[in-house]
Amino acid sequence: MTIIAAISCVFLFSILCETSALVLPNSTDLLLSNNNFTDIETALAAHLDSAKIPKARRKRYISQNDMIAILDYHNQVRGKVFPPASNMEYMVWDETLAKSAEAWAATCIWDHGPSYLLRFLGQNLSVRTGRYRSILQLVKPWYDEVKDYAFPYPQDCNPRCPMRCYGPMCTHYTQMVWATSNRIGCAIHTCQNMNVWGSVWRRAVYLVCNYAPKGNWIGEAPYKVGVPCSACPPSYGGSCTDNLCFPGVTSNYLYWFK
């Protein structure tokens, strides 16, 4: 999936809506089925461990409130998919994914990356300028793609790019509700000057969210249809909450801020 149109307004390459969030098409799709899950998870861990992520930071690039809002919103969306999902897993915060998102957000590059990680993780991006009341103003555009999505596969949700980008897109939404993508880590960074499709945006607010295991495997549906929690992986031991296979964790985010 190559480049994307806008969100809160009809967007062409030559028209920038600087007070609205823009999203980049999800270019992290794989051409092969997810048959070697264990190998991919092992490789992802190795690549994240070797990623060039600063060990010491003056401040975190996401607040606790923003992190909780993003995580809770994803689980809310995942628990209310239609048709209902039988194997939708509860999403938890992943510190390593957040650190890798932080490293990429700090580059202020309006593109998916770094390239050596994209084979192993999913990634959603959003950017806006101007004031905003909630971090969800950068996240909800991903969910809004649901109106153009026909389960189980994206139909016409392929924007025609790169010279001009138009047409609906769905891959941000499908990554959000990919059943096995049970970990997320995000970062937000304010870029003083950011090149967004040839236009320099001042003080652009850049959100990067990384997902694992990655979703959007071509030819596969994001989840199985059925009675909620009726097809959860055995590792969940039959635990279910809000239509999600629940891992039984006492906290899925606060430990990162200790």
UniProtKB/Swiss-Prot annotation:
Keyword Acetylation: no
Propeptide, residue positions: 22-60
Induction: Up-regulated by Noggin/NOG and retinoic acid. May be a direct retinoic acid target.
SMART domains reported in the protein's UniProt record: SCP
InterPro entries: Allrgn_V5/Tpx1_CS (IPR018244), CAP_dom (IPR014044), CAP_sf (IPR035940), CRISP-related (IPR001283), PI15_CAP (IPR047832)
Claim: Signal is one of the keywords in the record: yes
Protein's name according to its UniProt entry: Peptidase inhibitor 15
Organism: Gallus gallus
